[in-house]
Amino acid sequence: MAKDKLYLNQINRLKIPPHSLEAEQSVLGGLMLDNEQWDSVSEHVVADDFFSKPHRLIFQEMQKLLDLGYPIDLITLSESLEQKGKLESVGRFSYLAELSKNTPSTANITAYADIVRERAIVREMILVANKIANAGYDTQGRKSEELLDYAESSVFKIAEKRFKKDSGPKNVEQILDETVASIEKLFLSPHDGVTGINTGYQDLNKKTSGLQRSELIIIAARPSMGKTTFAMNLCENAAMLYDKPVLIFSLEMPGEQIMMRMLASLSRVNQARIRTGQLNNEDWARISGTINILLKKKNIYIDDSSALTPSEVRSRARRIYRENNGLTLIMVDYLQLMRVPSLSENRTLEIAEISRTLKALAKELQVPVIALSQLNRSLEQRSDKRPVNSDLRESGSLEQDADLIMFIYRDEIYNENSDLKGIAEIIIGKQRNGPIGTVRLTFNGHWSRFDNYSGQKYD
């Protein structure tokens, strides 16, 4: 038995990773015949995709020559390689001549490039699989959950590279086809003006047409204004109206507290009574009804891990998306609690990376991503304390990346004798594809809930 295992190990060590030297040769030879093919080829492959080291060196040298404005041919390429002492490493002049000679046409060069790329991806999968296996043998103190996150993020990085070639400029005909198809879909599907995810708030829907897929939505407010409550209400409404899951990342509050708020909101039961357990029969009946609905739908996921990194949020969101064949909404509370260890010494760059990743996630999964944000204390010094975009903490990247920015303002927080008690202003500070303005909602703090405002709204 031991001998058989040893034999298999030896066989595995002799395995040659998948590659196609013929396809690599055809790509390089084709580029020497027709330099104009470089742009299309470079959309498909990079130097590291070549299995043969001489081929990698040749491709790199071709790129350098083109960057300097020189043509690629047998003479220029061999001369450049010789000056750098690399000609011997690639097989000398005779091998370059063979590449050029054995490539009769460039007609299928992109197909050959695809073959090179496909083999490279499979090799990378093998490499990543080995790294994952090694991580399992040598955990370095990491728990199984951390190892799973590492494995998942490693595989998804390969997937990102795999689909990168689908990006880039599109002809107007293709974009028009996609646009007309979207318009026709909206025309044929009754939606009462809501083209995105229904917020559950009539006046807010009129302003935004719902929370649009692929958009990054920032909700910001000073403490005690109710930003977590508002964001949770949006998640609750989405969970009740749609079947696909809502994913909540709560970096600040434990999942149990989130659920208590949710039960109070959906059951219309005073959250103080829920927290203290002082419930009457009617309260229990309401809560039981809500629990039954939540268990029937089973479409809310809460991750209360602290200090998550953008890559962890992305990998976990992808996992839930994949397991459920889609998502309705993602919410992060709040983004300043996320961390990027490699950028920890520069908070501005750290927030920029977090913002960029969340925007990319929304676009990748085609779902709205809501991120809660803090506001600068400086607004407290103003007479009018209604927030504006510049009040966003580390505002530059957030304001730039966000498609929709909503601020919450409740006058009663600052003015004890305010005649606007129980009224919240949802201030739309930015909307990339719609108007800005203000919508009023009723704030029922004892239920941890914002509701539609029955009085007259204003713009």
From Swiss-Prot:
Q: What class of enzyme is it?
A: isomerase
Binding-site positions, ATP:
A221, R222, P223, S224, M225, G226, K227, T228
Q: Which GO terms describe its biological process?
A: DNA replication, synthesis of primer
Q: One GO cellular component from the entry?
A: primosome complex
Q: What is its EC number?
A: 5.6.2.3
Cite the SF4 helicase domain residue spans from the record: 190-457
Q: Which cysteines are joined by disulfide bonds?
A: none
Q: PROSITE patterns recorded for this chain?
A: SF4_HELICASE (PS51199)
> Known InterPro entries for this protein?
AAA+_ATPase, DNA_heli_DnaB-like_N_sf, DNA_helicase_DnaB, DNA_helicase_DnaB-like_C, DNA_helicase_DnaB-like_N, DNA_helicase_N/primase_C, P-loop_NTPase
Keyword flag Nucleotide-binding = yes
What keywords appear on the UniProt entry?
Answer: ATP-binding, DNA replication, DNA-binding, Helicase, Hydrolase, Isomerase, Nucleotide-binding, Primosome
GO molecular function of the protein, one example?
Answer: ATP hydrolysis activity
What role is this protein assigned?
Answer: The main replicative DNA helicase, it participates in initiation and elongation during chromosome replication. Travels ahead of the DNA replisome, separating dsDNA into templates for DNA synthesis. A processive ATP-dependent 5'-3' DNA helicase it has DNA-dependent ATPase activity.
For this protein, the record's PANTHER family field holds:
REPLICATIVE DNA HELICASE, REPLICATIVE DNA HELICASE DNAB
What is the name of the protein in this document? Replicative DNA helicase DnaB
The gene it comes from is dnaB
